[in-house]
């Protein structure tokens, strides 16, 4: 299940949801951190994006969810917009720095900050996932694998079986 409450909610309410889920045998799989842009070109939006992602990761850890999930962000106006600067070496480095800031600021005990693939953002392939994970170098950073988001060419479409096998083998 996804997390039914928002970050910033009362810790007693979080504890009640955590207990209710456990008692019912329900795993709270994720806390969505979508809508936040931790690599925004606007410094205020970037700082807000990082802070909000940290709050979501804290909630995930407190409610015993597996992860807080988001895309890496965009160099455009929106949090997940297409932009020519999204797939550059400088943006890759900025993603590494922002994810480190998110996870190092929270130091979660259980949950991970999981990055989801997108066709026009890093990670846009399994290999770029591996490159990011290696560069970020934090156990509290994880994978939220949505293979539909990397089926972006006729070759990948017609060979999705091989794509999936390769993805699971590598990840």
Tell where the protein language model's regions lie, with residue ranges:
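Hydrophobic residues within beta-strands of alpha/beta enzymes
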Residues: 1, 29-31, 68, 113
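Active-site beta-loop-alpha junctions enriched in small/polar residues
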Residues: 1-4, 33-36, 73-74, 116-120, ...
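Short, solvent-exposed loop/turn segments at secondary-structure boundaries
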Residues: 5-9, 40-45, 81-83, 154-159
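Aromatic-lined substrate-binding rim segments of carbohydrate-active enzymes
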Residues: 8-25, 32
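Structural motif corresponding to alpha-helix initiation and N-cap regions
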Residues: 10-15, 43, 54, 123-126, ...
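Active-site acidic/histidine proton-transfer and metal-coordination neighborhood
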Residues: 20-23, 38-143
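Glycoside hydrolase catalytic-domain groove-lining segments
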Residues: 137, 154-171
